[in-house]
């Protein structure tokens, strides 16, 4: 494709403006949780793969953790296996866990790996069971209604929480010029499999690697105030206040708590970004504009 002089000039300007950011992040690790609309639109999927390859090409080390809830739901439906959710968590019995492993560790993971490699990257697909990458234990879930005097412990099956990350494996892959793509399946002490929220896995991976950034792709423009305005930059103290006054609630709470834990655990910053925007990851890294909410570990 031949660019016009005007287009070529604009292209050169964009590259020039990105240079300070490239210099700043060369050699740094960025953990990106990939999910939502960005995984469903063919255009956005291709754009994401190209963005990841570009990051690696300029010396930044991306590590991808992906979700796949809709794809799991589709296969369960085709197999006539009912899905049940409690407080937003999929109840995962042994039969459902088999499907989760098939979809996340197989179909979804390999399609992402293939697309990145198709655009010039060297991606390698992993689940948390590979070399004990994501160690886990059964999540103890509770539920309480106003009528209860104490919380009720509920069994949601093979749903887990992260207890450890094999950072050495990921560092070896990154230094070998590979792009790790991780399915959020954990392994227990006895080799049992656990279905883990992808945001939580991404956060723990970012902490273990002391990543420069944790980036969570979502289907919203970012965190919003009660008037619907996007909050572009927040400290951990401000986030705590927004949770306390009810501005942040419901399905966003686990994502935000994951971001808070990451920055409090040594990650330089966490970003809640709009995955519906083309090239969202590059816009957030290489421009002042951004496409979401930045959270830093500040008390101001």
UniProtKB/Swiss-Prot annotation:
Q: Which domain of life is it from?
A: Bacteria
- Which biological pathway? Amino-acid biosynthesis; L-arginine biosynthesis; N(2)-acetyl-L-ornithine from L-glutamate: step 2/4
EC class (word)? transferase
Pfam family example for this protein? AA_kinase
Can you cite an annotated GO cellular component? Answer: cytoplasm
Reaction(s) this enzyme catalyzes, per UniProt: N-acetyl-L-glutamate + ATP = N-acetyl-L-glutamyl 5-phosphate + ADP
Q: Which UniProt keywords apply?
A: Amino-acid biosynthesis, Arginine biosynthesis, ATP-binding, Cytoplasm, Kinase, Nucleotide-binding, Transferase
What are the recorded Gene Ontology BP terms? arginine biosynthetic process via ornithine; L-arginine biosynthetic process
Q: Where is this site: Transition state stabilizer?
A: 33, 255
Tell me which residues bind substrate: 68-69, 90, 195
Report the InterPro entries cross-referenced here.
AceGlu_kinase-like_sf (IPR036393), AcgluKinase_fam (IPR004662), ArgB (IPR037528), Asp/Glu/Uridylate_kinase (IPR001048), Glu/AcGlu_kinase (IPR001057), NAGK-C (IPR041727)
What EC number(s) does its UniProt record assign? 2.7.2.8
The places in or outside the cell where this protein is found are: Cytoplasm
Q: Which Gene3D superfamilies match?
A: Acetylglutamate kinase-like
GO MF entries: acetylglutamate kinase activity; ATP binding
Q: Which family does it belong to?
A: Belongs to the acetylglutamate kinase family. ArgB subfamily.
Q: What does this protein do?
A: Catalyzes the ATP-dependent phosphorylation of N-acetyl-L-glutamate.
Its name, as the record gives it, is: Acetylglutamate kinase
């Amino acid at each position: 494709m031949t660019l016009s002089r005007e287009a070529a000039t604009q292209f050169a300007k964009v590259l020039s403006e990105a240079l300070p950011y490239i210099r700043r992040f060369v050699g740094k690790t960025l953990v990106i949780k990939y999910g939502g609309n960005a995984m469903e639109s063919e255009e956005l999927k291709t754009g994401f793969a190209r963005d990841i390859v570009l990051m690696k090409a300029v010396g930044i080390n991306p590590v991808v953790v992906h979700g796949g809830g809709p794809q799991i739901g589709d296969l369960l439906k085709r197999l006539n296996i009912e899905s049940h959710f409690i407080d937003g968590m999929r109840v995962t019995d042994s039969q459902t866990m088999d499907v989760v492993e098939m979809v996340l560790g197989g179909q979804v993971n390999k399609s992402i790996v293939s697309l990145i490699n198709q655009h010039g990257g060297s991606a390698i697909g992993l689940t948390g069971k590979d070399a004990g990458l994501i160690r886990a234990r059964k999540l103890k879930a509770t539920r309480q209604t106003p009528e209860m005097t104490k919380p009720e412990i509920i069994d949601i099956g093979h749903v887990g929480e992260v207890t450890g990350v094999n950072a050495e494996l990921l560092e070896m892959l990154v230094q070998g010029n590979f792009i790790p793509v991780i399915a959020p399946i954990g392994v227990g002490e006895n080799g049992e499999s656990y279905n883990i929220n992808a945001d939580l896995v991404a956060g723990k991976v970012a902490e273990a690697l002391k990543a420069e950034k944790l980036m969570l792709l979502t289907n919203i423009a970012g965190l919003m105030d009660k008037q619907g305005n996007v909050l572009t930059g927040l400290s951990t103290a401000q986030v705590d206040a927004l949770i306390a006054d009810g501005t942040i609630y419901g399905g966003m709470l686990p994502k935000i708590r994951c971001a808070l834990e990451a920055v409090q655990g040594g990650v330089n910053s966490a970003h809640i970004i709009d995955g519906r925007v083309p090239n969202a990851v590059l816009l957030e890294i290489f421009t002042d504009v951004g496409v979401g909410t930045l959270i830093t570990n500040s008390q101001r």
